[in-house]
Amino acid sequence: MSVRIEHDTFGEIEVPADKYWGAQTERSKRNFPVGKERMPIEVVYGFAQLKRAAALANFDLGKLSEAKKDAIVYACDQILSGELDEHFPLVVWQTGSGTQSNMNVNEVVSYVANMYLKDHQIDESIHPNDDVNESQSSNDTFPTAMHVALYQEVETKLEPALKLLRNTLKEKEDKFESIIKIGRTHLQDATPIKLGQEISGWRYMLDRCEIMLSESKKHILNLAIGGTAVGTGINAHPEFGDKVAHYISENTGYPFVSSENKFHALTAHDEVVQLHGTLKALAGDLMKIANDVRWLASGPRAGLAEISIPENEPGSSIMPGKVNPTQCEMLTMVAVQVMGNDTVVGFASSQGNFELNVYKPVIMHNTLQSIYLLADGMETFNNNCAVGIEPIEENIDNYLNQSLMLVTALNPHIGYEKAAQIAKKAHKEGLTLKESAIQTGYVTEEQFEAWIKPEDMVDPH
């Protein structure tokens, strides 16, 4: 392998000649051969947005020449294009401030920027610390990149998937509005409900999650940049944080602002905890929806079988013809993983000792993973399951007509105790509810027909 020699304050080190990173990245690769979890590329893109904006701000404030500013902006745009992904090899498991990833970006930006200067025959050079990292610390850059990445992924990936599934459920809700089925509470028969009403509960869960997500993501717009090492802003111009936030907003289209309290921004990540709490709430709702779907689709002959779902693949390696609710199982596993991630994020956020929380990479890793899993899970569940949900009306009608809980409609006419006697007699003697009611003498056939109307029970008002 061809190598070149790079150096840092620890001395010289060999770096692969075809890679754009420098000495500190190479040391990190050697010092932290831990796990397979690469630092998400979205974090790198968040850093690129930050370094780009910092170059513009530093130029405005007289800290960088125009040539250096242009070169850094060019390098950051190259990163954002996805052309340089291979030059960011570091794993999540590194220093808790994310210093190695900050330097990885600084080194790649300076390498590409110096090529830009050389190509344009400009007699200047760019240093990863003195120029790319001008007015910054890893302590304020990593949480800034983290917030930029999280906000963008919620906007561009999670929310569209949430809307997609929500809209499908709304279509099913409207389509099945006239189908009356038996309701169930405590896994026991209850009073009737429309299939459309049941699905409306699922849909409204996603409506509420969309609102909660919109509220919680607002706090992610606060950026730590400008706080530098401990929140005081040492070595940074007083206007630097606001200018960087302005330029990030200009390039992304999102209204980022510089946090009004940088001491908080460096040592606490409660804003991410709140965001992930919403992700956990969404995971809980998806768990409930997926469980309901697979129970209602259970069968085909010895289960509830009130709905059918698409048959996507063989379900068993030993039982021929068996088809399983695989999409529901996938979504419930996603939900469990997100709930586990929430525990990690909450505990890690609590570990801000004095002026700095040093669990930033694991907070970022788990939150991004939750966003990806939920987004991919909802889209896949929607496309391969939810869109194909159909009622099995013969079974729905059979359960409805057999249900003893229709007796609830008699309460206002004969009282709770007599209605309970009718239901118990029917269950014990294997009678229909109508037969039991007439045999007790509490109601006539005409009264039963007038009072027991499922269509009235689902819309009592």
Curated annotation (Swiss-Prot):
Top-level taxon in the UniProt lineage: Bacteria
Keywords attached to this entry: Cytoplasm, Lyase, Tricarboxylic acid cycle
Pathway connected to this protein: Carbohydrate metabolism; tricarboxylic acid cycle; (S)-malate from fumarate: step 1/1
Reactions this protein catalyses: (S)-malate = fumarate + H2O
Subcellular location: Cytoplasm
Gene Ontology terms for molecular function: fumarate hydratase activity
Coiled coil start-end: none
GO cellular component: cytoplasm
Keyword check for Nucleotide-binding: no
Enzyme Commission code(s) on record: 4.2.1.2
UniProt-listed Pfam families: FumaraseC_C, Lyase_1
One record GO biological process: fumarate metabolic process
Active site, per annotation: 186 (proton donor/acceptor), 316
Site, Important for catalytic activity: residue positions: 329
InterPro entries in alphabetical order: Fum_hydII (IPR005677), Fumarase/histidase_N (IPR024083), Fumarase_C_C (IPR018951), Fumarate_lyase_CS (IPR020557), Fumarate_lyase_fam (IPR000362), Fumarate_lyase_N (IPR022761), L-Aspartase-like (IPR008948)
UniProt key word Signal: no
Note: There are 2 substrate-binding sites: the catalytic A site, and the non-catalytic B site that may play a role in the transfer of substrate or product between the active site and the solvent. Alternatively, the B site may bind allosteric effectors.
Record's function text: Involved in the TCA cycle. Catalyzes the stereospecific interconversion of fumarate to L-malate.
Subunit organization: Homotetramer.
Entry protein name: Fumarate hydratase class II
Organism (species): Staphylococcus aureus (strain Mu50 / ATCC 700699)
Gene: fumC
